[in-house]
């Protein structure tokens, strides 16, 4: 079975070869994933290195091509650049499969024009959410409820990365709000949750336990990721996270199948779905759900 890592970075400071990356990713049990382009100069992670948008697209596209068809290129876009909306069309034409946005210097509402264009070109958006180790004042732009403005972009597919740590409870509530936006207000928004650390291992049990016991089924919307990079793919960290999550969901499933909370029961009845097996949350997060996010399958 193909195992996807949905959160892999490229860096301008640390060039990487596809061959070396594939050796490490294969050793960790990863056979595909979403690779994020070198960051734009406006992001602190660029460390002042200014590479034109098209060149950054080409670099990640060519790297993915060299790695094989199960690796998908994602363009990291700065929505404050004057031609940001035009870059979305260019990204589609260049073969990008998704957009990456980090709100380091602006509120998520500044992303709306780019996100509307992303809907037009059928490109999903991976947002950073949660605290940022970026050395600047950015926390107030990255809480889950800051992304309520995405209700103004019907048809958008987007993901919140890192389960929004440390605002994980807010992330759960936001997920519920988006479910309601679709059912009651026909927004046709698809929200995914990227579980890349981010959220430390000591928090993960309670986060996923609360998702489950509230009746919010992540079977088709959870994305497994590790948030490492192609130049120094951390096989030990990847293996640890895979094994940790596999065991976590198996242990949570026993409690979940015997839980009869009022809200969870109401959610299950409204969705007219059987109670999910939480082992499927893990299996799908590492396999089918990235393809769902990218629109390969529904």
Tell me what each language-model feature is.
Residues 1-113, 117-121, 194, 285, ...:
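Mid-domain alpha/beta scaffold segments of enzyme catalytic cores
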Residues 2-4, 125, 159, 224:
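Residue-level marker for buried hydrophobic side chains located in beta-strands
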Residues 15, 157-159, 163-298:
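H/E-rich (His + Asp/Glu) clusters that bind or coordinate divalent metals
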Residues 15, 79-82, 93-177:
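Divalent metal-binding pocket/active-site signature
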Residues 20-24, 56-63, 87-91, 110, ...:
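A general structural detector for well-ordered alpha-helical segments in enzyme core domains, enriched
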Residues 27, 93-96, 152, 185-188, ...:
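Alpha-helix termination/capping residues and helix-transition junctions
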Residues 35-40, 126-130, 227:
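Short loop/turn segments at strand-loop or loop-helix junctions that form parts
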Residues 40-54, 133-142, 233-243:
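Short, flexible/disordered intra-domain loops and linkers
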